[in-house]
Structures are given as structure tokens and as C-alpha cells.
Amino acid sequence: MQLTLEFGGGLELLCDSEKIHKVNVDLPNGADSDDFTMKHLLSWVRTNLIKERPEMFMKGDTVRPGVLVLVNDCDWELSGQLDTVIEDKDVVVFISTLHGG
């Protein structure tokens, strides 16, 4: 499954300072594309893209409070959060809304 993942608001620093990642994600064994959800994607991101301080991006199985998640420009809170189904060629954006001052 081909996806575009974008990180902003400082989260790109956790991914070798790259903001945009075009990735190929393998489906879990026995899963079809209708079964691939944000929960699976977040696990994949933690394992394959986050290079340092994963606790700044995730808390448990989900993103930390203060991280805005958009799936194809739609807030994931409107589409089921962890249960949001991810499809081929989707664009998923993670933006930290927490800033120092």
C-alpha cells in the first residue's frame, strides 16, 4: 500500500528532519486492504519512521494529546480515530499543536 505521510510542527525532528515520506506499507499477515486502520499505521510509523523519542509522538497505541491527525485533509476524530480505514494512496498528516514559548 502506497501512502504519503507528512510530519509538521516539530514532529519531523523525530523522523530525521524529513517532513514528507512516500512509503510502501505491507499489510499485516492475513489482512486485506479493508482491514488496515490507523492503529496499524501508527504501529508501522513507530517501528519504521520514528528515529528518536517515540514518546513525543505516541502514548500507548495512539498519538499523544496535542497531535493533530488528518487523513486526506479530514480530522481523524471525524472518521473514527484508531479505527479509521487507511487506503492505498491516502495522505496522512501529523502536526504537533504544542509549541514552546
Swiss-Prot record:
There is a cross-link at G101 (Glycyl lysine isopeptide (Gly-Lys) (interchain with K-? in acceptor proteins)). It is found in: Cytoplasm. The modification 1-thioglycine is found at G101. Pathway: tRNA modification; 5-methoxycarbonylmethyl-2-thiouridine-tRNA biosynthesis. Keywords: Cytoplasm, Isopeptide bond, tRNA processing, Ubl conjugation pathway. Its main location: cytoplasm. The keyword Cytoplasm applies. It comes from the Eukaryota. PANTHER family: RURM1 PROTEIN. Acts as a sulfur carrier required for 2-thiolation of mcm(5)S(2)U at tRNA wobble positions of cytosolic tRNA(Lys), tRNA(Glu) and tRNA(Gln). Serves as sulfur donor in tRNA 2-thiolation reaction by being thiocarboxylated (-COSH) at its C-terminus by MOCS3. The sulfur is then transferred to tRNA to form 2-thiolation of mcm(5)S(2)U. Also acts as a ubiquitin-like protein (UBL) that is covalently conjugated via an isopeptide bond to lysine residues of target proteins. This is Ubiquitin-related modifier 1 homolog 1. It comes from Arabidopsis thaliana (Mouse-ear cress). The gene is URM1-1.
